[in-house]
Amino acid sequence: MKAAKLLPILAIVALISFTSCANDSEENEAINSIEVPVTPQAKSIEIEIMELINAYRITEGLNALNNHNTVKAVASTHTDYMIEVNNVSHDNFFLRKQSLQANASANIVTENVGYGFSSAESVVNAWLASPSHRENIEGDYTDFDVSAEQNSAGKWYFTNIFIKR
């Protein structure tokens, strides 16, 4: 008799437990499945930016950084976003960071953004003239990449992301 009364209660407890675990699992899957877009082909201005940054790092006694397709893809999505909203920003940086942690094994993520510069040299020089941007360029990272896109008026937008794996 006691077992017959306990069985429905145990069934309810089990149902609640399984439902709770399923939600935790779904949440973890959502975080781990942040989509990484297809990596766009590198433009000459992007290659030049990466070369200038690595040349600067070498003159400072730092290691050259490796370019990374996943970093480029994530940077590209942010550059497209800045063009879409017509504003230079670090909006949604935490999402880019989570994506790179999940998809590029990044432990540390930082970024520089820019707008309106007409050449690779001018945007890199502007970043180097800014203490916070220069700190990112000189940081202890392993990989980086950059996205440069023009809006409909021909103005350039830049996103440069650094990671340490």
Regions found by a protein language model. Name each.
Residues 1-8:
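Bacterial N-terminal signal peptides that target proteins for export
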Residues 21-165:
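Functional surface patches built around histidine and acidic residues
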Residues 16-20:
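C-terminal motif of bacterial Sec signal peptides marking the signal peptidase cleavage site
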